[in-house]
Design a protein with these regions (language model features):
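Secondary-structure boundary elements
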Residues: 27-32, 69-70, 112-119, 184
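Polyanion-binding loop/helix "lid" in catalytic or ligand-binding cores
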Residues: 98-135
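Glycine-/charge-enriched secondary-structure boundary and capping motifs
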Residues: 17-35, 43-50, 127-206
Length: 206
């Protein structure tokens, strides 16, 4: 889909971080080209945290869902390898901070392009559970299983496998697709600094 606006929930324990949080929100909005239109502040939080929800539009019959994987689908892991571990949390693979804003926005549009032309059957963005954890979530909601070849997962050579599999990237996705579409998906995403590879196949052994 196309993101239109964001809202946030900001919880603050240490007053001195207010300005940095607001500056970061502003930078993020400019980077992604999506305005922050509202939010809620909890000024006496137990921790410093920021949560964001995004509102957007998408064609209802072209949504990428996490429950559409089918037996025989190929599994694709797609990640922007041009990044670095965040200085405050090494499992956060930062692919956006130093990137040109147009490329960051184009990466989102690229996935939208694939969805609207039915190249992707199911998918999820890689989130806190990491690469394999995100795949497991997709398989669970699809009531399926999978065989995965770890060595085929796109990886930055400077990061250990232990950290890489647990990391969540700024731009990273798990897709399932028909075999005949995989090569196009890989080549198309390469133009947007996203390395994609077939890493396995969906089966019925959930």
């Amino acid at each position: 889909g196309k993101p239109l606006a964001m809202v946030n929930i900001m919880s603050v324990k240490h007053d001195e971080i207010y300005e940095n949080l607001l500056a970061g929100i502003k930078d993020g909005c400019l980077k992604f080209g999506v305005p922050m239109v509202g939010g809620h502040l909890h000024p006496d939080g137990e921790v410093d945290s920021l949560g964001v929800a995004i509102v957007g539009i998408a064609k209802k019959d072209k949504l990428i869902t996490s429950f559409g994987a089918e037996v025989g689908d190929k599994i694709i892991v797609a990640i922007d390898l041009d990044g670095k571990p965040h200085e405050m949390f090494e499992l956060n693979w930062d692919t956006t901070y130093d990137k040109d804003k147009q490329l960051v926005q184009d990466q989102i549009t690229a996935v939208q392009y694939l969805a609207e032309r039915d190249y992707i059957k199911s998918g999820k963005d890689i989130s806190n559970p990491g690469i394999l954890g995100t795949l497991e979530m997709l398989l669970e909601t699809s009531d399926k299983g999978a065989i995965v070849n770890l060595e085929d997962i796109p990886k930055n050579e400077n990061i250990s496998w232990e950290n890489w599999l647990k990391s969540y990237p700024g731009s990273g996705f798990i897709f399932t697709a028909n075999e005949e579409n995989c090569e196009f998906i890989k080549e198309y995403l390469k133009d947007y600094s996203i390395e994609a590879n077939v890493v396995g196949e969906v089966n019925g052994e959930c």
